Amino acid sequence: MSKTIDFTTPRQRPSSRDVVAAPKACPLSSRAWERRILVFPLLISLLGGCAGRPENVLQPVAVTTNDISRVDMLVATTRKHAADPGELYSGERGTAISLNNLTVSIPPDENRKVGEVQWPKRVPPNPEKEFAVLKDEKVSSEQQALNWFRKNRNAKRQVIIFVHGFNNTYADAVFRFAQITHDAGTDAAPILFTWPSRASVLGYLYDKESTNYSRRALEDLIIQAARSPDVGDITILAHSMGTWLTAEALRGIAMREKTIPAKVRNVVLASPDIDVDVFRRQLIEMGPKRPQFTIFASTRDRALEVSRWISGGVNRVGGIDTTAYTDVLKSLGITVIDTSTCLLYTSPSPRD
């Protein structure tokens, strides 16, 4: 019998034993956290617009210096091809999933601030001071994808899949994921899943429908990655509206395959823009053998307040008062990091 999951009744506030990392000395300001944590505060600026940025910044450039860093990523998208090669893909919906292998250069540490994307001021970009694309190759066969996995796998065969949020161009998603991968110091093979967003604050409803449009494609990507012998561990990192797409894809996989692949071990949801009632149902339908979920939430997230208003006043998972739901979240094996207070609540994985 399925266990009832209730987010509607707040639980008692946590005792001191529940609080693992606490208050005033928030560790997120330290250099170590800046370079190691995957999502906070690296994702905080994702929702912002891109006014004033040059277009067509993805045209590959040549570099003559060796002091830059490189991130080699596989990019899967349901976007429509753009007419300009410097844009690659637009915000409109494509008819099939497309794969590209991109190499992004990141300026030397002395020329940038950790946690930020140094956007090109003009085209072509200056790799010494700005993010730039060094290589763009179309991946048109399964063998090419397998070759990429083998080239980029680490000793533990770890993969990280990033699903961006609302209001992102293709370039936004590519540069931001490159920044997260580099600044987190991870050597997991990076895969970006980017869905059709019109990159407009007025495009919320179009973007939401685009996540539904892209659900099956993300399911297929996760399943194919899990089936690869070159992959041993998958972490999924999603932000904002991308968390809805991620949760729906995992739910769909569980229903199609009867269970979520065991290789999908960690799912990180940053500022999840998901109706709390819907999230409850998604968790139930994922089944008992779910991955370990970590949620970054804040009652001060203004973007989620707007989403809550648009969605009929129903709380978003990323905007709930986590201290009021400690017991129920722990019972579900969910770890919560409250970014408004820097409190961390840990729970064992449902698979433990």
Model-derived segments and their meaning:
Residues 10, 23-38:
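Bacterial N-terminal signal peptides that target proteins for export
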Residues 39-46:
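Bacterial N-terminal signal peptides
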Residues 51-63, 78-79, 83-99, 103-105, ...:
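Serine-dependent carboxylesterase/thioesterase catalytic core
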Residues 95-150:
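Aromatic- and Gly/Pro-rich amphipathic surface segment
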Residues 153-157:
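Proline/glycine-enriched tight loop/beta-turn segments at coil->beta junctions
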Residues 158-163:
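Short beta-strand element of the alpha/beta-hydrolase
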Residues 345-352:
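Conserved small/polar residues in nucleotide/adenosyl-binding loops
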